Every structure is written in structure tokens, then in C-alpha cells.
């Protein structure tokens, strides 16, 4: 749970910085922001905040196995059989949702197969979203929205 909160705070810190203007985005509809930042509708981190929060919520629900029957005892982290080295033949595309919970991707990978992220296991869509968030040390990517992988909403 603490890891999820830290990831959320990290993403919120990145969203508070605003989006840097790049040559690839010039000429699109712009909305002026404070401190001289220019926001292109739908692509700046502030406008993507709802999407980021959605994926973090999916990450949290998937990690706790919400909507699944649970044995008594402490909460266990959940991952599909493929992520645990099991057979992919029985692997469903989505986990069943209970009482209005969001349908979240159930495909998990370890960060070593995508991008080093302190050894966390994250949904593939979350990893793709994190790859497109720039920091002051890395240039903003040319493509702002990640292309959804199969099984992502």
C-alpha cells in the first residue's frame, strides 16, 4: 500500500511541473497557463491526471485482488498465473469486477522486462504510462499518449 501511495505522489509531483513546449507540438491549439507554460488540451500532465489516477486505482485494486474471493488472513498480492510462471492457456484477458469496480487490465509484468522501476510489478499499461512521463532530467517524449497494448481500456 505504501508503494502505491509513493507512486501516486511521484506522478502528482510530475503533473505539478507542467508540460514543456516541444517543436513537435507547436501549431496546435494552446491554452496559456501560469508561469509561461503552454498546455495543449488533453496532452499536458494536468489534463492527463484523471487517466494517471485511474491506472493507479487499477494497480491498487489488482494488487489487493479486489473482487476476488479471499481466504481469511492477511491480504496477499495478486498476479495472474502467467506473471507467476504458470500456463498462459488459462489466463483471462480481464479479471471480473464486483459492484461497479473499474475493469482493470489483469496482465502484470515484472519491471525487469520493461523498464527498471525498483523491482515493482506493475500492470503493463501502467508501465507504458510511466514511460511517457518526463522529468526535468529527461526530455519530453514526442508521443504524449501511450498506444494501448492489447487488453487495455
Swiss-Prot record:
GO CC annotations, alphabetized: extracellular region
Chief place where the protein resides: secreted
One biological process term in Gene Ontology: positive regulation of heart rate
Secretion signal span: 1-18
Subcellular location: Secreted
Keyword Secreted tagged: yes
Keywords for this protein: Disulfide bond, Secreted, Signal
Cysteines paired by S-S bonds: 39-44
Coiled-coil segments: none
Family: Belongs to the adrenomedullin family.
Function of the molecule: Probable non-functional remnant of adrenomedullin-5.
Protein name per the record: Putative adrenomedullin-5-like protein
Organism: Homo sapiens
